[in-house]
Amino acid sequence: MALLNSATLEFVRSHADEDVRHLAFLADRFPGVDMPAALDQIRGRQVAKVKIPAWAAVDGIVYPPHLSLEQCSGEAAARYKARLVRRLGVQSLVDLTGGMGVDFSWMAREVSQATYVERQEWLCALAKENFPRLRLSHVEVRQGEAEALLPALP
């Protein structure tokens, strides 16, 4: 998790299964820890264990704040969309509303070339961190408005 400093990363790993509401009261004891980021990561992994268990099983996945995680597709829906892509028999894919990248991460496995587009820079940063951890080496991440990027997309 390159987006987190080493103290925060260690805190996240050490307290992964604890109640974030309780941990929030311990911020003064851990001055080197970016507590809001740590709590986002801990809570994110806890939600992912239920919603996207395959992601939760991968060490180092970086999770967004709670709202983005709540709005993303679950693993079952993402796998279903990947089956649809497989049935289409296409070789390339462009996701114009990348978001957290859950749907994209499964659909991209079904094609030889995949492009993730997202207007929010911080979600693109998360995607660039997470996709290699998910063994997606044939993907491209582009930040910007879909309408502006469309003419240059494959």
Write out the residue ranges for each language-model feature:
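SAM-dependent transferase fold signal centered on methyltransferase-like domains
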Residues: M1-P154
